Amino acid sequence: VAGAEGEAVSAIKIAAELIKNFEGCRLKAYPDPGSGGDPWTIGWGATGPGIRRGVVWTQAQADGRLATDLVGYEAGVVKALGGAPATDSQRGALISMAYNIGTGALASSTLIKKHKAGDYAGAAAEFARWNK
């Protein structure tokens, strides 16, 4: 168990770096660019209850929310993998993907199906299909 936890922390760190590179951090809530309203977003891409127009966070709040959220997304990735092997880097990328598309979408995606089948190159190519 200790080894698994250590691996999860490493994968979460990788995911956090990926998310920080792609998302950027905004400390004042902003509307969804597509709808001009809900869902309002703040920090490193956080949405949900309490995030609305006028909400302002500190950097510590944004970083803390990301860290908390990633623990849940990591659990969703482990479940989606269903025991299939994954390196820390692969898990980190999958956690980052789950953060953006949700664990349900990841679990039913061609990306995860290819990974579970051992087609790692095919799985890697699937990331680009989600780039909108």
Walk through the language-model features, giving the residues of each.
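Cell-wall polysaccharide-cleaving catalytic domain and substrate-binding groove, primarily
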Residues: 1-132
